[in-house]
C-alpha cells in the first residue's frame, strides 16, 4: 500500500523487532503474574502489538504527510528510533516465558495440515484486498501514487490518506510480528532485520512500481511467496545468511530494472494510444484538418 501511494517504509524491520519485544514483555509479565490466565496474557500481548503498530504508523505518517519530509528519510530515521527503543527495553536479550498456548497453538499448531498462523493471516489479506480494490480509499491511494497534483485537484485529502496508509502498514507489520513471535517462541530484538529488503523485493516482483500508482495485494502475495520459496531453497542448499542477502540483493536489482522497463513500455503504449486517437479524429474531420493546413 505504501509503495502504491508512491512512498517507502524502511522501518518495517525495526517495527517487527519492537513489536516482538514489546508484546512478549507484556505477555510474559501477565502470564508470570497469573499462570492460569494464558488467554488474558495473549490478549494483552496482542493489544500491545497493535498499539505499537499504530504508534509506528503514526510516526511515519505524520512525518510524511504533515511535515512533508521525504518518506525515505522519515522511515530511515524512525527505523533507527524503533531499533533503539527495542534494544533499550530488551537490553539485547530475548524475552522468553511465553504461554504454551501461544507458542504451541498459534506458533506451530495445524488445522487440516495448514499452519494456524497462515489461517490467521487470511482475513487480514482479504480485508486489505477489499480495501484496495473496492473502496474509495483504495482509489485515492492509486490516484496519489499516479499523480499527486491531479489527486489534489480532484479533491483527494492527501495528508489524511497518506497518514491512514502508513498506520495500516504499521498495524499489519505489527500483526505479522505477533505471529512471528509465536513462531520463534520468544521476543527477539533482531527479528525482522531482513524485512525491508524482502518486502520491497516481493512487492516489486508482484507488480508494484517504485514510482507509485501500480500494484495490488494479490501481486504482492505472489511476490512474497516467490521470495519465501527462494529463501527456503537457499536454506536447503545450505547457503549461509550472508550469501542469501547477496542473492536477494541481486534479485531486487533485477526487479527494479524490470520495473523500469515495464514503465517505459507503459509510457510507449500510452503515447501510441494518444497518436492513434489523434489520427482517428483527423480522419473523421478532414475538412477541419484541411482548414488548419490552409491557415498555416
Each predicted region: which residue ranges?
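Single transmembrane alpha-helix segments in multi-pass membrane proteins
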Residues: 1-35, 62-69, 207-217, 250
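Alpha-helical transmembrane segments within multi-pass membrane transporters and channels
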Residues: 31-79, 222-223
